[in-house]
């Protein structure tokens, strides 16, 4: 399945919640009606079956992290092999993706922009350039912006927006140096309560 390149707000309306696909400069609810789906008959939201709810939750999380279907299923399989709660394991694996860590540190305004920064070799991990968005970041790894990329206006703008948001407790960022430490893998309580990962586990367990 190809990566979605259409309107970002359309996806948020489809899922009925902010997927954080836009920069966050202004509130998303001022730009679109999240309570109604996109399209001519968007106001009429169908009543979803149990399977429909599970599918929607999977699509929502997949879109939040910008992961394709095959990648997402592989993350689930890995999460199921690990000890502990499969749903929590899944979210933690997604949180350790390099593009997501770059976003959490505020170097990219969105995960899509962060993914582009990684792909364009603007990001280093422990002093080495890494251009694989799915690269798994480990606890205590240091993520930084390459010196020649630090003048990019979009990175500076992203850091300004990030300064207005509540900072994640599991990363430590020096905005002046454009460098951050991934202190630990986040706990479930650190992450969005609007995600119901158990629905995804039920979907893939069938």
From Swiss-Prot:
One GO BP: translation
SUPFAM superfamilies: Alpha-L RNA-binding motif
GO cellular component: small ribosomal subunit
Domain S4 RNA-binding intervals: 96-156
Top-level taxon of origin: Bacteria
Keywords on record: Ribonucleoprotein, Ribosomal protein, RNA-binding, rRNA-binding
Molecular functions per Gene Ontology: rRNA binding; structural constituent of ribosome
InterPro entries, per the entry: Ribosomal_uS4, Ribosomal_uS4_bac-type, Ribosomal_uS4_CS, Ribosomal_uS4_N, S4_RNA-bd, S4_RNA-bd_sf
Ribonucleoprotein keyword on record: yes
Pfam families to which the protein is assigned, alphabetical: Ribosomal_S4 (PF00163), S4 (PF01479)
Alphabetical list of NCBIfam families matching this protein: PRK05327.1, rpsD_bact
Assembly behavior: Part of the 30S ribosomal subunit. Contacts protein S5. The interaction surface between S4 and S5 is involved in control of translational fidelity.
Family to which this protein belongs: Belongs to the universal ribosomal protein uS4 family.
Entry function: One of the primary rRNA binding proteins, it binds directly to 16S rRNA where it nucleates assembly of the body of the 30S subunit. With S5 and S12 plays an important role in translational accuracy.
Name of the protein in question: Small ribosomal subunit protein uS4
UniProt source species: Shewanella oneidensis (strain ATCC 700550 / JCM 31522 / CIP 106686 / LMG 19005 / NCIMB 14063 / MR-1)
